From Swiss-Prot:
Record organism: Campylobacter jejuni (strain RM1221)
Gene name per UniProt: glmM
Function, in words: Catalyzes the conversion of glucosamine-6-phosphate to glucosamine-1-phosphate.
Annotated catalytic residues: 99 (phosphoserine intermediate)
Keyword Transcription carried by entry: no
Protein name as it appears in the record: Phosphoglucosamine mutase
Alphabetized InterPro entries for the sequence: A-D-PHexomutase_a/b/a-I (IPR005844), A-D-PHexomutase_a/b/a-I/II/III (IPR016055), A-D-PHexomutase_a/b/a-II (IPR005845), A-D-PHexomutase_a/b/a-III (IPR005846), A-D-PHexomutase_C (IPR005843), A-D-PHexomutase_C_sf (IPR036900), A-D-PHexomutase_CS (IPR016066), Alpha-D-phosphohexomutase_SF (IPR005841)
CC per GO annotation: cytosol
Length: 445
């Protein structure tokens, strides 16, 4: 049985992800990290879901039972956990979040001592420990060796300083009116503070978390309300974050929601013009064909990888690169962060606007994405795609019609993601109906 998906362990809180699983998983991870322990401290943060308290207590119980000390820092963005794990010299960091998912889901993500997400090999080792009853039992310590847990509430300042240091020293946000949608999530304190301290006029939306409203009709997955507010308030730009603030969606001054690949393209060019872009840009296999065309036109190479910001980071390391991301809004500036950081991306786009003295719409309009259709189809089972009868023929037929395809299963849900891309939207709509019917029969039979 696999516990880890594309981004940690995730599922419905209280059902799949209950206190027993969380405690045992924490013990398994702690056993793994003990071999490389330097400080015997593990950092634990969370987003604003009500179930986070249950899972946090279970994780603390699991870690202290095998002798680890735990530092609890409360609601903080996922990239803050990555940064603070290394900054506070902890052996590992744990983030309790289901990112953009609804409140009833939750998840557990791990970071190593350097703030990096774990490789699949390490995740498999932790899973092996999880299912090894003898090892779990043998790792429990005597009473006098049980670890301690302490809560620290003032570490937010360290993260804010690191975020502000990513913004050019010769610029100020004083001329910008910015609307922030913080999704009732982990950035509800951090994001407004950063933008205000850098001088922006800030209007904040969805900043009253109650444990049940995270991502609900707000944030990066639902930018419609932000778009309306940007227009109504005549703001220069709007930024929407998801529940754990590792992704960003930009809304221009006209209330138009920017395509994630357009954002990647213009930020890559901005880095190149400053002489800061190293090696090729990395995007995922879901990236729009127009991104590659735009980058190549400006002498920038594009490499692709599997979906997931940890795969983007792995490819960047392999290539010696420092910039990449996903169409969904995970954008990695590896000079400043070890994972996707919505706040850093928002500040870099603000710096681009200010340095060019141009509007958000004119900057983003440089990349004109090809039409894409993406459907998340609920399915009964996940069959091996290579063994589905007729799929090769279907893909060949679409290819002959100049339609690019990508079919992949969700790593966390019973869904298949169906992506079609072409220059003709009517053709896409027609062919998508056929594709949906094909997979309904193949995977719900």
């Amino acid at each position: 049985m696999r516990l880890f998906g594309t981004d940690g362990v995730r599922g419905k809180a209280g059902e799949f992800l209950d206190s027993f699983l969380a405690m045992r998983l924490a013990m398994a991870a702690g056993i793994y990290f003990k071999d490389k322990s330097i400080t015997n401290n593990i950092l634990v943060g969370k987003d604003t879901r009500r179930s986070g308290y249950m899972i946090e207590n279970a994780i603390v119980s699991g870690l202290t039972s095998i002798g680890y000390n735990v530092i609890q820092i409360g609601p903080m963005p996922t990239p803050a956990i990555a940064f603070l794990t290394e900054d506070m010299r902890c052996d590992a960091g744990i983030m309790i979040s289901a990112s953009h998912n609804p409140y009833y889901d939750n998840g557990i993500k791990f970071f190593d001592a350097h703030g990096n997400k774990l490789s699949e090999d390490i995740e498999k080792k932790i899973e092996e420990i999880y299912f090894d009853d003898k090892l779990i039992q043998a790792s429990k310590v005597d009473m006098e060796k049980i670890g301690q847990a302490k809560r620290i509430d003032d570490v937010i300042g360290r993260y804010i300083v690191s975020i502000k240091n990513s913004f050019p020293k010769d610029l100020t946000l004083k001329s910008l009116r910015v609307v922030l949608d913080v999704a009732h999530g982990a950035a509800y304190k951090v994001a407004p503070t950063v933008f205000k301290e850098l001088g922006a006029e800030v209007i904040v939306m969805s900043d009253k978390p109650n444990g049940l409203n995270i991502n609900e009709n707000c944030g990066a997955l639902h930018p419609v309300n932000l778009a309306a507010e940007v227009k109504r308030l005549r703001a220069d730009v709007g930024f929407a974050f998801d529940g754990d603030a590792d992704r960003l969606v930009v809304v221009d001054e006209k209330g138009e929601v920017a395509n994630g690949d357009s954002l990647l393209g213009v930020l890559a060019l901005y880095l190149k013009e400053q002489g800061k872009l190293q090696s090729s840009v990395v995007a995922t296999i879901m990236s729009n064909g127009a991104l590659k065309e735009f980058l190549n036109k400006h002498g920038i190479e594009l490499d692709t990888c599997n979906v997931g910001d940890k795969y983007v980071l792995e490819k960047l390391k392999a290539n010696g690169g420092n910039f990449g991301g996903e169409q969904s809004g995970h954008i990695i500036f590896s000079d400043y962060a070890k994972t996707g950081d919505g706040l850093i991306a928002a500040l870099q786009f603000s710096a681009l606007m200010l340095s060019k003295k141009k509007s958000a719409s004119s900057i983003l309009g440089q990349v004109k994405p090809y039409p894409q259709l993406l459907i998340n189809l609920k399915i009964a089972e996940k069959k091996d795609l290579d063994k589905i009868k007729g799929l090769k023929e279907l893909k060949k037929d679409l290819e002959n019609k100049n339609i690019n395809t990508l079919f992949r299963y969700s790593g966390t849900e019973n869904l298949i993601r169906l992506l079609l891309e072409a220059r003709d939207i009517k053709l896409l709509e027609k062919e998508m109906k056929n594709v949906v019917e094909f997979f309904k029969k193949a995977l719900n039979g």
